[in-house]
Amino acid sequence: MFTLKSRLDTSSKEFKNNSKEFEKLLAEYKSILKANTMGGSPQAVAKHKERKKLLARERIDLLIDPNTPFLELSSLAGYDQYDNDFPSAGIITGIGVVHGRETVIIANDATVKGGTYMQFTVKKHLRAQEIAMENHLTCVYMVDSGGAFLPEQDTVFPDRDHFGRIFYNQARLSAMGIPQIAIVMGSCTAGGAYVPAMSDETIIVKNQGTIFLGGPPLVKAATGEEVTAEELGGAEVHTSVSGVADHFAENDTHAIQICRNILENPECREKQKLNTVPIEEPLYDPRELYGIAPVDLRKLVDPREVIMRIVDGSKFQEFKAKYATTVVTGFAYIMGYPVGIIANYGVLYYSKYVLFHTLHNKIFLILNHLFLKHILSINSFSISISLLILNLMKFSFYDIWLK
């Protein structure tokens, strides 16, 4: 491959202005992200801990292998919606490493509206299932949910890709032989009750986890009978009477250890092996991306200046260099992985795009001047990253996940 040479003037006034603006934007982004990942209100967090329950992120930390990263997905879902009462849409999703294998983790955050689902919660849950399905990754549900958020039920239930799709996906995952493990760590009411019932193996925590379609108040209203939540759908009932749950746990920590034991040898298809090469650092400092992205969005940027600061050794084998010149396509390596790159800085000629995309079984990095969109397909892992926020993604996705 040829080594790209930069024509960028890093001492120019424009570069310094761009860098200053985007460092400011990055700081703002990190501040919003931190606030959004704190969970519910301090009062809700305190009440959660009083019940001797671990927080959702603490549960994930215990599940994944020590000193391994957790690639969180959709962390800003629900941001600036519903008066920001649904940080991270009340659910944490991502990919972690359990016994050396990538595993999709979906954890309800009960400190946010009792772990209930509004429209963005549903979409975030579905997206995580889709990633598990397309990449044949084991799926772990850490269930602590009151089901649908009833004040917003008109936006949760009606659509094809709304609440019921979760259970459709569970059936498909099961049919594909992809393991699904549910840990019932709190309330599983109404729609939330179906998740553990449809999983391959279910763990339930004593005096804490409950599974029922309607709780004690509904039973009393319908039949006049008074029962406790534990009597109606607790760990003892579901492990010894109904058989809905398979494993009885004393507390959150015990439940997570049982889950790790189950995942020690899952029957799941081996992921595809990619031909990797030794890793090389880019010849140009990736932090220069701050100065490349223009403050004025109307100004175009040569995507090669971006590519040479991302790929190994700044080496790039361009494909169809003289055809549809507003699109740059080619091959490179990132962290030793073979990558196909598509970048545009003008009109996107779909004929060139389609020709390039017919190559199978490669990671695809799409650099688009106008939008940010993530795409996952069965035969390729495609990521679309806006030049405007590439500097933000660089230090989260690239450093944590590909390493």
Language-model segments: what does each one mean?
Residues 1-97:
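N-terminal amphipathic, basic-rich helices that act as targeting or association modules
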Residues 51-77, 284-316:
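Amphipathic alpha-helical
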Residues 76-107, 111, 133-134, 298-358, ...:
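Non-catalytic terminal/interface segments that mediate subunit docking, oligomerization
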Residues 95-97, 104-106, 140-142, 181-184, ...:
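Structured core elements
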Residues 111-137, 145, 150-202, 347-358, ...:
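Thiamine diphosphate
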Residues 143-271, 403:
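Conserved catalytic cores of soluble enzyme domains
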Residues 250-302:
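Terminal amphipathic helices with adjacent charged low-complexity linkers/tails
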Residues 367-372, 376, 387:
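Short hydrophobic targeting helices and cationic amphipathic motifs
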